């Protein structure tokens, strides 16, 4: 698998998010939920040479892919080979050891949350990682419309949680798809 094509987000929404990161001169970036590593690779290579890029993922969990870890590791190595300080933390983003490792590598200019999609997951990731972020936090899947017949994706609660999170912050939304994806951004 090539890092260039392994993206779970809308490509145009991701490009717009990258443009925002570049505009505010992000030099350190944290991604929670990397799956195959495509977004980490695309975002990482768009930042200034030498930027610190950290990914946190737990391959094989719900909405993840059991075979994702080798691809994710390959993408992190590809970013590192381009002259970036890229690191991967394999583990649950809610575990104390993982949080401690992330904090030891921070602070970060920007964080992108695309891990667990339940209310508890999103809230916990936002609360844990917005505090070590100095500029902005992006949250993926704010436009996802739940389809009752799609049982395996029925617990995606991002749109509802996004409505609560954005109330306390200056924010904007990147929405190019009508029923899927979407990136919400809050300034911290």
Question: Language-model features: where?
Answer:
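S-adenosylmethionine/decaboxylated-SAM
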Residues: 2-188
């Amino acid at each position: 698998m090539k890092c260039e094509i392994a993206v779970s987000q809308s490509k145009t929404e991701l490009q717009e998010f990258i443009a925002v990161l570049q505009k505010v001169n992000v030099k350190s970036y944290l991604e929670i939920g990397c799956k195959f590593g495509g977004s980490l690779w695309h975002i990482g290579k768009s930042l200034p040479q030498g930027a610190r890029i950290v990914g946190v993922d737990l391959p094989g969990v719900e909405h993840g892919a059991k075979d994702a870890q080798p691809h994710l590791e390959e993408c992190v190595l590809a970013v590192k080979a381009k002259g970036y300080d890229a690191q991967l933390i394999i583990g649950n983003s809610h575990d104390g050891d993982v949080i401690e490792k992330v904090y030891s590598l921070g602070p970060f200019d920007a964080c992108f949350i695309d891990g667990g999609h339940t209310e508890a997951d999103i809230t916990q990731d936002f609360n844990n990682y917005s505090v070590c972020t100095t500029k902005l936090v992006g949250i993926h899947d704010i436009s996802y419309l739940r389809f009752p017949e799609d049982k395996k994706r029925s617990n995606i609660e991002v749109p509802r949680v996004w409505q609560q999170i954005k109330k306390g912050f200056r924010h904007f939304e990147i929405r190019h798809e009508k029923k899927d994806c979407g990136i919400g951004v809050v300034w911290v």
